[in-house]
Design a protein with these regions (language model features):
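Extracytoplasmic/periplasmic substrate-recognition and gating elements
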Residues: 102, 107-109, 148-215, 262
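Bilobed periplasmic-binding protein-like "clamshell/Venus-flytrap" ligand-binding domains
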Residues: 2-3, 50-64, 202-213
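Short helix-initiation/N-cap motifs at beta->coil->alpha
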Residues: 35-40, 113-127
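Periplasmic solute-binding protein
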Residues: 1-30, 42, 61-86, 168-182, ...
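Short, solvent-exposed loop/beta-turn-alpha elements that line the ligand-binding surface or hinge
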Residues: 30-34, 57-59, 80-99, 147-152, ...
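Glycine-centered hinge/linker elements that transmit conformational signals in sensory
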Residues: 42-49, 85-118, 163
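Conserved C-terminal helix/tail region of periplasmic/extracytoplasmic solute-binding proteins
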Residues: 205, 219, 224, 237-283
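Paired acidic/hydrophobic, glycine-rich loop segments that form the ligand-binding mouth/hinge
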Residues: 131-136
């Protein structure tokens, strides 16, 4: 099957900037580019931990929900990748990824938590239990269910960040949303679906409103800058320039997602990182 794309976004992470400033760690953050170095990230975690915040961040691994966040933090820290460039194999067992997983495991304030997935992490970040979230995007930044958009439940500032890197060139995971048609053998219904999709996703007078309704960004440059004048969306658009490889097309993707959180659980339970990632790749 094929997808007719409509909109996309870049997944990122977020920090409680109020708490980061409180412990003097905002010096490690480039607030204009929303970037930081791996060393700066680790120093920020350390400052928060020593400042009295025992639970700074979580490597959540109860399931696949939000797994793009744990992949991105691990791949970005030391220049690792999730697959090879040709999308023929998975590379979790690279030296760069092993170093990142081991570093996260050994860092005080970061916990491998098999009881939560991405959605749970967001809740814990919003309620102040965690001071960082690895499962984040513009939909979360704009969420106003429990307070104004961009604030935690207690009113602290939420600041979106690219994942930390040694190189200064973050590679973010992207999400692409669109439409598909199932071939049920009824040509009339298939044609009607085509007409509907063409209207929603390609009609010059409609597509802008369709993308706006998604709260994401257009996949086609022809749609133009639909968020001109919107300070939050314009600022967040900086993350689109950090989009990395769309490796979800690699064969065995469904199995890889399951094996990923299983691997993180094993590391959290004390298994050697080298052993855990070898099992991931072998499976």
């Amino acid at each position: 099957y094929y997808e007719y794309p409509l909109c996309m976004t870049a997944h990122c992470m977020a920090v409680n900037m109020t708490k980061v400033k409180e412990v003097g760690a905002d010096q490690y953050i480039d607030t204009d580019k929303h970037t930081w170095s791996t060393d700066g990230f680790l120093k920020t975690v350390d400052a928060l931990y020593n400042g009295g915040y025992e639970n700074v961040a979580a490597i959540y691994c109860a399931g696949q929900g939000g797994d793009q966040g744990t992949r991105a933090i691990i791949n970005n820290m030391y220049g690792g990748t999730f697959t090879d460039a040709a999308h023929t194999k998975y590379t979790a067992d690279s030296a760069e990824n092993i170093k990142a997983i081991q570093t996260l495991h050994d860092t005080k304030g970061i916990n491998f938590d098999a009881s939560i997935a991405g959605g749970d992490e967001i809740t814990l970040f919003r309620n102040g239990t965690l001071q960082m979230a690895f499962c984040w995007n513009i939909a979360q930044q704009a969420n106003s269910d429990n307070n104004d958009a961009g604030l935690t439940n207690d009113g602290d500032e939420i600041f979106p960040m690219a994942f930390p890197t040694d190189s200064g060139d973050p590679k973010l995971c992207g999400g692409i949303w669109g439409f598909g048609i199932f071939d049920n053998g009824d040509e009339a219904k298939i044609e009607a679906a085509r007409t509907f999709i063409d209207f929603i996703a390609a009609d010059p007078d409609q597509v802008k409103d369709s993308v706006l309704a998604s709260t994401y960004f257009p996949v086609r440059t022809s749609v133009g800058d639909i968020y001109a004048g919107n300070e939050v969306m314009s600022e967040y658009s900086k993350f689109m320039g950090y989009l990395g490889d769309y490796y979800q097309i690699t064969p065995g993707w469904t199995t890889a997602r399951t094996e990923w959180w299983n691997m993180l659980q094993r590391v959290g339970s004390g298994e050697a990182v080298e052993t855990a990632v070898k099992t991931f790749v072998d499976n």
